Amino acid sequence: MKNNNSNLKNSEIGKNVEEDKQKNSTGECIKKNEEIKLTVGQQKDNTREKQTDKENIIKPSIAEKPLKYDNSDSKEESKSAKGEEKTSEQQKQIKENSLEKNLLKEGQSTGLNKQEKISNAEKNEDNDISSPLGKVVARQRKFFETNKTLDINFRLLQLKRLRLQIKAYYDQICSAFRQDLNKLEFDVVLTELGIVMKELNYTISNLIRLAKPKKVRTSLANFPSKGYVLRDPYGVVMIASPWNYPLQLTLVPLIGAIAGGNTAIVKPSRNTPNITKVIKKMLSIFDEDYVYIVTNEEEISDIFDTKFDFIFYTGSPKKAREIAEKQAKYLTPMILELGGKSPCIVDKDANIDLSAKRVVWGKFLNAGQTCVAPDYVLVHSEIKDKFVESAKKWIGKFYYEHHLDAQKEEFLPTFVKIVKKSDVLRLQNLMKEGVVECGGKAHGQVIEPTLLTGLDWDNKIMQEEVFGPIMPVLTFDDLDDVIRKFRLIDKPLALYYFGKDKEAIEKVKTQIAFGGGCINDTIMHFTEEKLPFGGVGQSGMGNYHGARTFYAFTREKSVLDKGLWFDLTLRYPQATKGKIRFAKTYFKI
């Protein structure tokens, strides 16, 4: 892969701008009712850049209102226009915003032009493209073959456009989450937007470094030579995301797909229709030949029968097996982010109150609809009663409003709802076994945080992933028995251990197979971009986050560049005793 990290030459920029003007005048590469307008005013004064809100407008094609930049930037720019003095830090921020907006102005249509589309259609006339989605994939593959996505500057531009869109659609995103999940703005920022923006900012800041070919030292046998490892995009990738974290689990993989130089087919969940609608509007800035959002029922029905170059799927193990079976004939590489029953172990030397607080938060986050949530808790029998009381205390503080005068507690209506109505009945049935220590009531699609005791490994709730606001509590006496038990069941996506003994911690880390986890906390390993996130066995394969998101959507390609001025004759026929002796010495035989 050719390195295109150097700055664009003025002549190349001019050429791109001229091409875009020609395309806009004829309506090429612009979807119906879509329009992106950017006008950046430039002043001749070298000491200042003056920009006003009127000069910086992006109009999303389907959005209800124009995309706006951050208000603070607009105010600073307005002050600059009036001649007020600024600090160097403010001037630097304005300059960065100006550069980004200029990039958006210059940058470039992301799809095929009209003639290329006609040519593509002609070439595929005789191809067996039996489905509407198959035609989209064919167009995307044609666009990928233009090599536009190989340009690092092109990729950076698209990531910056995406960042602006996310900021512009903030209110619509929060509103959609309230409708589909009953999720508050704070939770949307904490569990969705915050993670997306952190990943996006990291990728933009590090893409040039990540994409740069890595030099490797070569052996004496290949003297003289140079070795390189390049990161190649796969081509047309498919991203299928679930309903529990519909924005985060859609956009983070998409960031990797764009950064890696791929085109993308994105299938959000049908169970969160309002969020899916916002995602589609937000991503409408990209041409369908580059990023396509699947929402049509006809396309969804046969989506996994279509040949892709790479698949990133987040969902259930059952559906993952179906996908793997259908894609086996194509030998399609894929990453599967699944789930399972992630255990939480609370040992006798744990800080009981802090452990209960962190377990309760991790378990009932998003109403338990989190793939890495503690599915059940194994508490040492010596501290079981104290742990249960502490857990009940924290459930009350987090999710109930206290009415001291009336001497009662009232469940808060702001708790996240169960998305699928069928799951409400399933969860109610799971609560029929054991002792309900607190909760246990359903209010429509909202189920109160529930604590269950009096259970063992044979109960129904221990045979399937809970994926809801029910926390089963079991007891144990010997950690070694727990480790032996875990070797007999499916490997979990996550595991959490609370305790202080270093020997016990080392046993948990080394003798139990799990995707990832925490010592003395829950969930938080997911938030670290330097820690790879992924499952093992039934809980998934492959990983991502941070640099590994870029690596997930690219493949390593090895290149040996051999010199011409010297040629080692050892490898060529005929063999002599001297050659054999040298070879044995070299290979230490």
Q: Can you name each region flagged by the protein language model?
A:
Residues 155, 200, 261, 291, ...:
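Residue-level signal for inorganic ion chemistry
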Residues 3-125:
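Long, intrinsically disordered, low-complexity tracts enriched in Ser/Thr with interspersed Pro
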Residues 68, 114-127, 150-154, 443-589:
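Conserved C-terminal structural/oligomerization subdomain of aldehyde/semialdehyde dehydrogenase
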Residues 285-286, 319-457, 519, 587-588:
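ALDH superfamily catalytic-core signature
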Residues 148, 163-166, 170, 181, ...:
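Structural signal for hydrophobic packing residues in well-ordered secondary-structure cores
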Residues 142-148, 239, 344-346, 376-379, ...:
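Short, well-ordered beta-strand elements within core beta-sheets of diverse protein domains
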Residues 219-354:
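Rossmann-like NAD(P) dinucleotide-binding subdomain of oxidoreductase/dehydrogenase enzymes
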Residues 92, 111-228:
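N-terminal Rossmann-like NAD(P)+-binding subdomain of aldehyde/semialdehyde dehydrogenases
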